[in-house]
Regions:
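Conserved core segment of the aminotransferase class I/II
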Residues: 227-302, 306, 389-390
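Hydrophobic residues in well-ordered beta-strands that form the structural core
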Residues: 124, 145, 173, 204-206, ...
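Helix C-cap/helix->beta junction micro-motif
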Residues: 28-31, 139, 199-200, 315, ...
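Conserved core of the PLP fold type I
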Residues: 60, 64-195, 212-213, 219-227, ...
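N-terminal small-domain helix-loop-helix segment of the aminotransferase-like
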Residues: 2-103, 110, 288-289, 391-395
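PLP-dependent enzyme catalytic core of the Aspartate aminotransferase-like
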Residues: 82, 86, 163, 335, ...
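Conserved glycine-rich beta-strand-loop-beta hairpin in the small C-terminal domain of fold type I
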Residues: 284, 299-309, 319-331, 363
Length: 395
């Protein structure tokens, strides 16, 4: 059988971090010591029963058995507009300022292709969600990462963008609460980003994947649109995976600047499929859930974070307070790279974590653990790590 070469574009793409982790996990013998996977962010909690009941009823509706519209049902776009008005005080035109798609990855990967020209720069943070770097490659653009660190609360400083990069910027991508560090946005961050956008006439994309998960239930993460005029300069993507525990349902949307939405919708008709009508009906139900139901869904992560942070303190493993998302960003012990430490945990105690280097050079020296593994698994994993006495050596 002949073996054909991949295209130059595919050859130049980085190996997906999570596919690498999946391969590593498959190589571990777990018969005597079951693998505990803390590497990925797939929610372990059930989808709200109201949403499940909604899709069960919608599946039998013959109106959902044909090809769905590329634009999404008018009812789901109106539900999105109502949701944003209720939660963020933002008025949206359902026809021109909203796009729906099969999961937010399509949005954060597709919007760059819709607005960035070859040779331009996509500016984001380093570390960052790896898809932003691959989106630059697929757009034939350059990626410039603003290094963020613990000293800066993992927030970028746009004064650090070189003039050459700023002059040829095609898009700025932000993601707060931040994956992988858990950092929370401040009003000053979004104000600075907007000033940069206006100064250099560059659009903004805010990946609001962890919109519902601040450091506490009172600490509601900021939308980009909390800033005046932000809708004029950017778009915000939203996923149902985290807020509504609907990771397998594949539904997301983008809202904001009409010209960006229009460009993306055109790309969407050539590149992606549409969303099953029954899933759209279920999305309407999810968007209509009362605020207290949403708080119940995310309270699980707040409780887990509190317990895990307490356990980390017992291990003398330093951890930053006030982290959003359902991840914790942890410094590795002295003498290890992030990859070495991740491999040690996998081989010695069968605990899989995400090495910081997988999120960019700025992630070196850290690992990311997920709080979606369940209470017992999380504490059991930390007990296994404690048995290695790695942090006793640093005391």
């Amino acid at each position: 059988m002949p073996e054909f070469r991949a295209s130059q574009l595919v050859d130049e793409l980085e190996e997906n971090l999570f596919s690498v982790l999946e391969k590593l996990a498959s190589q571990v013998n777990t018969e005597d010591l079951p693998l505990i996977d803390l590497s990925s962010g797939s929610p372990d909690q059930p989808t709200p029963p109201e949403v499940v009941a909604s899709v069960q009823a919608a599946i039998t509706d013959s109106k959902n058995h044909g090809y769905p519209s590329f634009w999404g049902k008018p009812q789901v776009r109106q539900a999105i507009a109502d949701f944003y008005l209720r939660h963020y005080g933002v008025e949206l035109d359902p026809d021109t300022e909203i796009a729906v798609f099969q999961g937010s990855l399509i949005g954060v990967g597709g919007i760059p292709r819709a607005v960035v020209n070859p040779g331009q720069y996509i500016i984001s943070t380093d570390p960052c969600y790896p898809i932003y770097r691959s989106a630059a490659r697929q757009s034939q653009a350059h990626f410039f990462g603003l290094v963020v660190s613990e000293e800066s609360q993992f927030l970028p400083d746009f004064a650090d963008v070189p003039d050459e990069v700023a002059r040829h910027a095609g898009l700025v991508i932000l993601n707060y609460p931040h994956n992988p560090t858990g950092a929370l946005a401040t009003p000053e961050l979004f104000a600075d980003a907007l000033q940069f956008a206006q100064r250099h006439n560059v659009p903004l994309l805010h990946d609001f994947a962890y919109a519902a998960i601040g450091s506490t239930h009172e600490d509601v993460p900021l939308s980009l649109f909390s800033q005046p005029d932000a809708k004029e300069w950017g778009v915000e993507t939203y996923t149902f995976s985290k807020t509504f525990n609907m990771a397998g349902w594949r539904f997301g949307f983008a809202v904001g600047n009409a010209s960006i939405i229009k460009a993306f919708k055109k790309l969407h008709t050539h590149s992606y499929s549409t969303v099953f009508g029954a899933i759209q009906d279920a999305a309407i139900t999810a968007l209509s859930l009362p605020d207290e139901r949403l708080q119940q869904l995310v309270a699980v992560y707040h409780q887990r974070r509190k317990r895990v942070v307490q356990k980390l303190a017992e291990l003398r493993w330093p951890v930053r307070e006030s982290q959003g998302t359902f991840f914790l960003w942890l410094a590795v012990p002295a003498g290890f790279s992030s990859q070495q430490f991740a491999e040690l945990l996998l081989q010695e105690v069968h605990v899989l974590v995400a090495p910081g280097i997988g999120f960019g050079k700025g992630g070196e020296g850290y690992i990311r653990i997920s709080l979606t593994a369940g209470d017992a698994a999380l504490l059991h994993a930390l007990d296994r790590i404690a048995a290695l006495h790695l942090f006793d050596r640093q005391a």
